[in-house]
Amino acid sequence: MPFLDIQKRFGLNIDRWWTIQSAEQPYKLAPRCHAFEKEWIECAHGIGAIRAEKECKIEYDDFIECLLRQKTMRRVNAIRRQRDKLIKEGKYTPPPHHIGKGEPRP
């Protein structure tokens, strides 16, 4: 038992928020990766860690991609590099509002 239990004093359960996104959320909004986590938990529930690691790999990989967005960021960086290359070669001119020369907005 902690010396000063702030979570209990204020009625918060922060540990639950940090471990499972499927838990009750403070403003009743589903987290971004709730569906992927739910699929992974449903797949892995009751079969053990070793079997779950093999049999639920697809669900786990989807969940981790949703959390970390590594593939998405790699794709965005590839698109950005290609755009910069085309600009450098003179084959592409970005619109004025992309380079800060557009009309001012109210």
From Swiss-Prot:
Subunit structure: Mammalian complex I is composed of 45 different subunits. This is a component of the iron-sulfur (IP) fragment of the enzyme.
Annotated InterPro entries: NADH_UbQ_OxRdtase_FeS-su5
Protein name in UniProt: NADH dehydrogenase [ubiquinone] iron-sulfur protein 5
Record keywords, A-Z: Disulfide bond, Electron transport, Membrane, Mitochondrion, Mitochondrion inner membrane, Respiratory chain, Transport
Superkingdom, natural source: Eukaryota
Domain CHCH: start-end pairs: 30-74
The organism of origin for this protein: Macaca fascicularis (Crab-eating macaque)
Disulfide bonds: 33-66, 43-56
Pfam families per the UniProt record, alphabetical: Ndufs5
GO cellular component, one term: mitochondrion
Topology within the bilayer: Peripheral membrane protein
Described purpose of this protein according to its UniProt entry: Accessory subunit of the mitochondrial membrane respiratory chain NADH dehydrogenase (Complex I), that is believed not to be involved in catalysis. Complex I functions in the transfer of electrons from NADH to the respiratory chain. The immediate electron acceptor for the enzyme is believed to be ubiquinone.
